[in-house]
Amino acid sequence: MNDILAKILAVKAEEVATARQMRSEAELLREAQARQDVRGFAQAIEDKISQGKAGVIAEIKKASPSKGVLRENFDPAEIAASYAMHGAACLSVLTDVQFFQGSHDNLRRARAACSLPVLRKDFIIDPYQIISARAMGADCVLLIVAALAPAQLRDLETLAIDLGMDVLVEVHDAKELDAALALRTPLIGINNRNLRTFETTLQTTLDLLPMIPAGKRVVTESGILKPEDVRLMREHDVQAFLVGEAFMRANDPGVELARLVA
């Protein structure tokens, strides 16, 4: 595990411990189970693709550790509405505070502004965070193979599914892909950014594609910056995209989405 990821995960452990003191897991679970408003995340992607369109998971994030602040004029509800208007299949909302300047409230506001399913984008290491995701309205959670042992992956996935959510499992290489393919989720996110060097290459997705069986939906993540990137991926039958930076830097994120997948 690289230093940046290890640092983030240490902060997450502290955050979970603090949150548990503020509110018990049992109480949070009651709130999560009481919500009957799950929007089908994986299905929304498939619906777009079945229409011959790209299945775009459009991301809402103010900043990142590697790039700093991406967007000064940051209104999650306004961005979400623009994404919905311009053809996004789903939203991804950063809820990490320290490294990405996100928040739980950003997710709530984005979800309330449209009818799209929403991914809680965070570094999940504990069941408490899965329960919290559903309680705040998330329809899908991200599990990062690099951050979790195989038993943790299975247990967290099972909990998410039991709460009605979908799971996007993220990999960076062939070894991580093996762990991801052992899970039930059809959503396999391939992150094109090297966790050690932070360099990005779309070749990562292309290299892993032959190892992925039918019945799984590949989501290519990071480095999708221009229409040619989308065309390259779709030529290789990669039809789902998680895009953040390109949209966040644009004057109108939704208009940029439409331009990217035109």
From Swiss-Prot:
An individual GO BP term: L-tryptophan biosynthetic process
Name this protein carries in UniProt: Indole-3-glycerol phosphate synthase
The lineage is: Bacteria, Pseudomonadati, Pseudomonadota, Betaproteobacteria, Burkholderiales
Asked if the record carries the keyword Transferase, the reply is no
Q: What family is this protein classified in?
A: Belongs to the TrpC family.
| Reactions that this protein is recorded to catalyse | 1-(2-carboxyphenylamino)-1-deoxy-D-ribulose 5-phosphate + H(+) = (1S,2R)-1-C-(indol-3-yl)glycerol 3-phosphate + CO2 + H2O
Q: Species name for this entry?
A: Bordetella parapertussis (strain 12822 / ATCC BAA-587 / NCTC 13253)
The EC code for this enzyme is 4.1.1.48
Q: In which pathway does it act?
A: Amino-acid biosynthesis; L-tryptophan biosynthesis; L-tryptophan from chorismate: step 4/5
